Amino acid sequence: MDLLGAHVSIAGGIHNAVDRGVSSGCDVIQIFTQNSNQWKGKAVSPADAQLFRDKLAASGLSHVMSHDIYLINLAAAPGEVKDKSLIAFKEEMQRCAALGIGKIVMHPGSHTGDGEDTGIRRICEAFDQLFGEVPQFTGKVLLENTAGQGTNLGYRFDHLKAIIEGSSYPTRFGVCFDTCHAFASGYPIADRDGYRRTFDEFDRALGIDKLMAFHLNDSKKGLGCKVDRHEHIGAGALGLEPFRFILNDPHFKLVPKFIETPKGDADEMDALNLKLLRSLIEG
């Protein structure tokens, strides 16, 4: 099993994500557990949770990962956005506990002009609160590296390191490495030398064992553009080589890898992008 998959929709019920993943040829899937553009999500009923768990067990999928909603900003100053963010992430943890999902990917957030150190401190404080409030979620939060747009945090590995080391729960974190975001933020992963230097830096900052998931996305824009625009595999500025490097790197053989590339009218592009990625695997 290649541990390749996609972000899939939960339209019509969260259990439908399993069928969509299987239909697209996924080994693993990533989902939103609620509408990603609304603050308030619906609690998962025991019946819905059991249906999801049963379908997942029968599906052959090996990993399911959740992604938090885009509105959440745990780096925000005290106020309405911070309060809503804490509630929304707490509810995300509760839903994942009910569904049996053990990993939540999240964007660290934006300091909105208050400075990187201040934003990182706020994130650490938020997670110290959240892990204490939701003991039933026993999984990990995967911090996703970002493209570096605006005042967003997470575009350097040192940001992720500071969050993990600044938390009272350092063992509850991992990292999700997004290829588009890394390239956009200035990591030169498109050639062999840059790839090696990037992951050597990651290992020095965080330890390679902290890398627990990949988002495999090509980039519409060039190196260091600070713009987050995903493209089909091999059709953007990254090309095919960095994906070939990752898929054949023995360090990452057991790390689940998810595409978040454009879907097409009926999600047909997921199967095509996954087929292309599998063609890059050697041996």
From Swiss-Prot:
GO terms for biological process: base-excision repair. Zn(2+) 3 binds at residues 181, 228, 230. Binds 3 Zn(2+) ions. Its EC number is 3.1.21.2. InterPro entries: AP_endonuc_2, AP_endonuc_F2_Zn_BS, Xyl_isomerase-like_sf, Xyl_isomerase-like_TIM-brl. Zn(2+) 2 binds at residues 144, 178, 215, 260. GO terms for molecular function: deoxyribonuclease IV (phage-T4-induced) activity; DNA binding; DNA-(apurinic or apyrimidinic site) endonuclease activity; phosphoric diester hydrolase activity; zinc ion binding. Its cofactor is Zn(2+). NCBIfam families: nfo (TIGR00587). Endonuclease IV plays a role in DNA repair. It cleaves phosphodiester bonds at apurinic or apyrimidinic (AP) sites, generating a 3'-hydroxyl group and a 5'-terminal sugar phosphate. This is Probable endonuclease 4. The gene is nfo.
